[in-house]
Amino acid sequence: MYTLARQLLFKLSPETSHDLSLDLIGAGGRLGLNGVLCKQPAALPVSVMGLNFANPVGLAAGLDKNGAAIDGFAQLGFGFVEIGTVTPRAQPGNPKPRLFRLPEATAIINRMGFNNLGVDHLLERVRAARYDGVLGINIGKNFDTPVERAVDDYLICLNKVYGHASYITVNISSPNTPGLRSLQFGDSLKQLLDALAERREQLAGEHGKRVPLAIKIAPDMSDEETALVAATLMESGMDAVIATNTTMGREGVENLPYGGEAGGLSGAPVLEKSTHIVKVLSAELGGKMPIIAAGGITEGRHAAEKIAAGASLVQIYSGFIYRGPALIREAVDAIAAMPRA
């Protein structure tokens, strides 16, 4: 069924197809149809960050930036749903076209630029949703906020989403907001994380609950840089790391149509690079902080490979675009079939 739907959707421009798919998934969720039409994955509960997940396969941020289809995605069988990236104020993102399919490589290039309707709108959608599972909210900074003032934007979003999120992801790794990735390193990273950790403890007291903080990092780092990031995350008291965002590299797609477009590359070509980051993080963290693996999962076995590399959970986005809900079931089954330690 999804194969036919994809053939029709892929005749449209990528962004039109994305918006239409979001509308359809959202409508199906409101009507309660998605769970009926889609075969559900096997139960595979797991506890991570003190949260109970129905299964370890989640929706990565970016597909539902404004929380428009939370119930719809949950009904497809995802073990958790992450929405955003959301910024304090609404912003249009980068000029179109800004989203490109590379079907020969099962890949996508995007330079969306955190287009979203703002944190207040997102929270309206969260409050309207019936979903009671694990909901992550991914936060970022506005395009016109100087990098030196980025912490202000993250704190605004943290304050607003805190009471509505199961966990909060701090996105410092999108390649489409100038200067953002510089926040992953050195004093910039430590100052940001320390500010977030301090405010989180205050919010925990006010709300009577401690909401986990996850940091999403890029795949375009050396082993040494990754090790330094891991050390800073532990020192600052973060609860998880998401590895990884899209890559600026173009290995394997250089000669394909749209392969030279600016933006972040996701899908199959980022699998090896992303999984390597997971392995490095796992060695550095030594089990002291869970890893949520994202990047390049287009087959169920890729999800199992991420878990074997040291991840506790996985997320999919580009693979879902190409494979549909079947990939969720396939990934859950592959993880369930792994030998127990």
Swiss-Prot record:
Cofactor: binding comment: Binds 1 FMN per subunit.
BP GO annotations: 'de novo' pyrimidine nucleobase biosynthetic process; 'de novo' UMP biosynthetic process
Pathway entry: Pyrimidine metabolism; UMP biosynthesis via de novo pathway; orotate from (S)-dihydroorotate (quinone route): step 1/1
SUPFAM superfamilies xrefs: FMN-linked oxidoreductases
Residues binding FMN, per UniProt: 61-65, 85, 138, 171, 216, 244, 267, 296, 317-318
Taxonomy, superkingdom: Bacteria
Name of the protein this chain belongs to: Dihydroorotate dehydrogenase (quinone)
Lineage, broadest ranks: Bacteria, Pseudomonadati, Pseudomonadota, Gammaproteobacteria, Pseudomonadales
